[in-house]
Amino acid sequence: MVLKYFLETFKSRKATLNPIMSNSTPTARIKIGYDLAEVCRAAAGEIQRMADRSATPAKPLTFALSGGSTPRSLHAILAGDPAVRDRLPWHRLHFFWGDERHVPSDDPQSNYRMAYETLLSLAPVPTQNIHRVPAEEPDAALAAEKYEQELQAFFKLEAGQPPRFDCILLGMGPDGHTASLFPGTEALHETKRLVVANWVEKFKTYRITLTVPVLNHADLIVFLVSGAEKAEALKEVLQGDYRPDRFPAQLIRPDNGKLLWIVDKAAARYLTHSIII
């Protein structure tokens, strides 16, 4: 699949249109902000617009949250800025996770704990709208199976059918991983499961992660990438040869949705204005 990218910059910076391969190719956008704060402000705006566009007031809006440090600033805006917080229909927002560490929910490394402390406990989110990974299970494979069952029940899925999230938030590491899809790991090649326990050798642990088919079935995928340490990987993911075993973020190519990269200047330092993958 060929993706065509529209490169945008924020505020007074001039937008640049990138080459278009054909009218039928799926379109992704890249927004480049000055710093992490600007990146997260833009992401909050995307979430707000998505909620505003929702045509069915009673329909749940489903999000998959990401881990890492980058989302903290986004959470602070969503939960702490009245201009954003007071406009979001929190009673309709359902929160899931793109991946989780195999630790109890109160562990400092828990993605759930980070999201709860920085967002979910500070916003009027009904308890029943929080769908965390049962990562306290001693057996990581069982935790993945239980979370898959949670998705199947909530989204009322038929066998083999992936859920359609309204929005999946993703990050990217300096090694090009996203969610817990790490270079060279088995989960990169999973096509039938919704959730798997993925052994990550460099950490000597399992990570529980949504699979590529689930991520690519979302209505909107938003990558948030910040920091100079990710610049080389970002260039490879967006402009390098297609090597998803080495740079797993290249696997994220929505089958019938939108893809948006919001990155800061430090992360975008090696990108050119001609981005076609």
Where in the sequence are the language-model features?
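N-terminal glycine-/serine-/threonine-rich phosphate-binding loop
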Residues: 20-63, 141
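Class I SAM-dependent methyltransferase SAM-binding "motif I" and its flanking Rossmann-like core
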Residues: 167-213
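ATP/nucleoside-binding phosphotransfer catalytic cores, i.e., glycine-rich phosphate-binding loops
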Residues: 213, 219-277
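A glycine- and small-aliphatic-rich helix-loop capping segment at beta-alpha/alpha-beta transitions
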Residues: 76-88, 113, 117, 183-192, ...
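Glycine-rich beta-strand-to-loop/alpha-helix junction loops that act as flexible
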Residues: 65-70, 170-174, 226
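Glycine-rich N-terminal segment of FAD-binding domains in flavoprotein oxidoreductases
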Residues: 52-83
